[in-house]
Amino acid sequence: LYLNTMTVEDRKEVRPYYYKTQMEKIKGIHAQITGNPQTRFTIEELSSMYEIPLTTMKKCFKDVYGDSIYSYQKRYRMNLAANMLLQDKAKEIQEIASCLGYENPGKFSSAFRSVMGLSPVEYRFRKGEILDGK
């Protein structure tokens, strides 16, 4: 029993190593996504634009930002939409969808619900009431 406790290793998370050039490319990809929320980039486009192998890009991005590129991009856009819904209540949902690159408001509503748990209309109503103190 004593020997078993002596051989137990601390299980520390091993962080992968990435080259500086890879990290710069991943930061560039992040800036591309956050700077252009109206555009839905495919991973193939990003890989080509930043000249980084697809597998390396996907793994590195997830290790750095904690989510896949697709999920990060979607969550980022829906958080922007949530802010827009509450900041400008006169702006129509279709207009917000269009600002974020969605041509179909139904697809936007579906994406919004999958991230926020409420439709854009419900979100605006419920969160707006909380902010207004009602």
Give short role names for the model-derived ranges.
Residues L1-A31, G35, D63, D67-S68:
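Short, Lys/Arg-enriched, Trp-marked, Pro/Gly-tolerant hinge/linker segments that flank
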Residues K27-G35, R40-E45, D63-E103, R126-K134:
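Terminal helix-turn-helix DNA-binding modules in bacterial transcription factors
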Residues N36, P53-K58:
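Conserved mid-sequence domains
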Residues E45-I52:
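Helix-turn-helix
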Residues M49, C99-L100, V115:
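Residues within the alpha-helical elements of helix-turn-helix
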Residues T55, P105-G106, V121:
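Key DNA-contact positions within bacterial/archaeal DNA-binding proteins
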Residues M57, F61, K107-F108, F112:
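Short hydrophobic/aromatic patch on the recognition helix
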Residues M116, V121, F125-E129:
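Extended amphipathic alpha-helical coiled-coil/heptad-repeat regions
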